[in-house]
Amino acid sequence: MVNPGSSSQPPPVTAGSLSWKRCAGCGGKIADRFLLYAMDSYWHSRCLKCSCCQAQLGDIGTSCYTKSGMILCRNDYIRLFGNSGACSACGQSIPASELVMRAQGNVYHLKCFTCSTCRNRLVPGDRFHYINGSLFCEHDRPTALINGHLNSLQSNPLLPDQKVC
């Protein structure tokens, strides 16, 4: 598990270094089969808990959210922080429980993340280009980009922002 607000990945762990990892929750050595990594720290699966309701977040498939130094379950995150802001395309509010797409710091509803030319929805796995505030599918990227006169700011395969750590 990785903090969604952090671009850092956990440091590599080798078999010989397992005994050196300490749990951020209890301070004990982690000898578990799996290491959990959230908020730049390692955790026992039993110690990674919601700061509000104490629900265990270390189970496979359980999402956790981090904000303001707290680790939260989905329900408490939504209760405390409401929505994700406004969609950069339509300007409407985005509920915190809704999946979003992001490009260059802008946030979009899934339905609003569309090519500026053909209006087709861009979905996870699609390649896209973000140029001067506009989204373009691979097919409709500007001619200047194809000819090498512009640089695409974003041309990686698209992945949804699920806000999981």
Swiss-Prot record:
Which superkingdom, per the lineage?
Eukaryota
Q: What is any one of the record's Gene Ontology cellular component terms?
A: cell leading edge
- Summarize the protein's role: Transcription cofactor. Plays a role in establishing motor neuron identity, in concert with MNX1, acting, at least in part, to disrupt LDB1-LHX3 complexes thereby negatively modulating interneuron genes in motor neurons.
The species is: Mus musculus
Protein name listed in UniProt: LIM domain transcription factor LMO4
**UniProt cross-references to PROSITE patterns, sorted A to Z:** LIM_DOMAIN_1 (PS00478), LIM_DOMAIN_2 (PS50023)
* Residue span(s) of domain LIM zinc-binding: 23-83, 87-147
Q: Which N-terminal stretch is annotated as signal sequence?
A: none
Q: Which GO terms describe its molecular function?
A: DNA-binding transcription factor binding; metal ion binding; transcription corepressor activity
Q: What is the tissue localization of expression for this protein?
A: Expressed in a wide variety of tissues.
| Assigned keywords, A-Z | LIM domain, Metal-binding, Repeat, Transcription, Transcription regulation, Zinc
Note the PANTHER family from the entry: LD11652P (PTHR45787), LIM DOMAIN TRANSCRIPTION FACTOR LMO4 (PTHR45787:SF5)
Tell me one GO biological process term: regulation of cell fate specification
**Pfam families according to UniProt:** LIM (PF00412)
Record note on quaternary structure: Interacts strongly with LDBS. Interacts with LDB2 and LDB1. Interaction with complexes consisting of at least LDB1 and LHX3 acts to disassemble the complex; may preferentially disassemble LDB1-LHX3 complexes rather than complexes consisting of LDB1, LHX3 and ISL1. Interacts (via the LIM zinc-binding domain 1) with RBBP8. Interacts with both RPPB8 and LDB1 through the same face and cannot bind to both proteins simultaneously. Interacts with BRCA1 (via the BRCT domains); the interaction represses BRCA1 transcriptional activity. Interacts with DEAF1; LMO4 blocks export from nucleus.
Provide the phenotype resulting from gene inactivation.
Answer: Overall patterning of ventral spinal cord neurons is normal at 12.5 dpc and 14.5 dpc, but there are additional ectopic V2 interneurons (V2-INs) at all axial levels of the spinal cord; phenotype exacerbated in an MNX1 mutant background. In an MNX1 mutant background, genes typically expressed in V2-INs expressed ectopically in motor neurons (MNs). Abnormal guidance of motor axons in an MNX1 mutant background.
CDD domains noted in UniProt: LIM1_LMO4, LIM2_LMO4
